[in-house]
Amino acid sequence: MGRAEKVVLAYSGGVDTSVCIPYLMHEWGVKEVITLAADLGQGEELGPIKQKALNSGAVVSLVEDGREEFITDYAFPAIKANALYENRYPLATALARPLIAKMLVRAAEKYGADAVAHGCTAKGNDQVRFDLGILAQNPEIKVLAPAREWGMSREEAITYGEQYGLTFPVKKSSPFSIDKNLLGRSIEAGPLEDPMCEPPEEVFEMVKAISDTPDEPEYLEIGFEKGVPVMVNGEALGPVALISKLNEIVGNHGIGRIDMIENRVVGIKSREIYESPAMCVLVDAHRDLESLTLTADVTQYKRGMEQTYSELIYRGLWFSPLKQAVDAFIEQTQERVTGVVRLKLHKGTARIVGRRSEKSIYTPDLATYGADDKFNHESAEGFIYIWGLPTRVWAQANK
């Protein structure tokens, strides 16, 4: 008896998920493998994926469009939270996993599958994100993870797949692992495992090299409504179109590359290369607009919550009670975050040069040092006396 009768496999067309199809059938005795490829903006690589899965042994190959849901229900909440894992990574890959988990469970219930599967390895973060995301949707369903158990290196997995007629777009001598969606690309493995190895230019796709960027700067205006980006340069755009346009504009100026050593969920450090042009400028612009529209105490408290939020996403806890509670807090803070932020893009930098909002609590006649100054200067001395009282008492007690 096999591990399961019918399995829905999260399928990307890459090495691990492709090898999972024959492995599930020949090694684990699964009778039917249904593949599900979530279209989250991968682009051309999704073209042949349906037939590739069928050629690899799948009985049904599904490609489902999740782009709108991905941006609206996952990316936009992350932007509201200014979510950057370890203050750098805008979580492009991590945000996709809970949605894919949700889609897997939907497909399993539709097709009567008794298990779902993924191709994540035992060292990665995605195994945690998929397993927890799946179990949050259906705690009774089996979760199979062949790559966590088969013990094959990437080169051995390629050889195994080739025995069953599979072909791969990577070379055994330099097998980069690449994940792509609308929010960005992640690149790892191969020579990049040496943290001193500079990434070769050919691994980048979304963000131009500085030497290839325009010599003249470009100004970019992003409009927000209640924390959600809705306009680019005065043009109202839907979620998918907005992210796509920003990726193109920002990436053209060499903005959005990230090279970092990050701390994985399983306790190891890994070297990761990311491209995420739209998300990088959206988080920066959104944070700046908050500085114009939120009070100091709310802003300060929210910054701590943002770190928690980022860690929850990274660690696979999207559907957790704490994540839901933090969501409620962040949503409340966004009622006033409406306005426009202006950025200057040039040679790898996105510098914020202006912002405006009808909800602004910046008051020019209180901030000015000119003749229009309405700040009550006489109140400063009394304020300092009260504010400094604990310091003065402490100093006297410690003479």
UniProtKB/Swiss-Prot annotation:
Keyword set includes Ligase: yes
Keywords associated with the record: Amino-acid biosynthesis, Arginine biosynthesis, ATP-binding, Cytoplasm, Ligase, Nucleotide-binding
Domain of life of the source: Bacteria
A single GO molecular function term of this UniProt record: argininosuccinate synthase activity
Keyword flag Transmembrane helix: no
Any single Pfam family the record assigns to this protein: Arginosuc_synth
Protein localization: Cytoplasm
InterPro entries, sorted: Arginosuc_syn_C (IPR048268), Arginosuc_syn_N (IPR048267), Arginosuc_synth (IPR001518), Arginosuc_synth_CS (IPR018223), Arginosuc_synth_type_1_subfam (IPR023434), AS_cat/multimer_dom_body (IPR024074), Rossmann-like_a/b/a_fold (IPR014729)
GO biological process, one term: argininosuccinate metabolic process
Binding site for L-citrulline: Y89, N125, R129, S177, S186, E262, Y274
UniProt binding sites for L-aspartate: T121, N125, D126
UniProt xrefs under CDD domains: ASS
Catalytic reaction(s) noted: L-citrulline + L-aspartate + ATP = 2-(N(omega)-L-arginino)succinate + AMP + diphosphate + H(+)
CC per GO annotation: cytoplasm
Pathway: Amino-acid biosynthesis; L-arginine biosynthesis; L-arginine from L-ornithine and carbamoyl phosphate: step 2/3
EC number per UniProt: 6.3.4.5
Matching Gene3D superfamilies: Argininosuccinate synthetase, chain A, domain 2, HUPs, Single helix bin
Stored PANTHER family: ARGININOSUCCINATE SYNTHASE (PTHR11587:SF2)
Membership in a protein family: Belongs to the argininosuccinate synthase family. Type 1 subfamily.
Quaternary assembly: Homotetramer.
Name of the protein: Argininosuccinate synthase
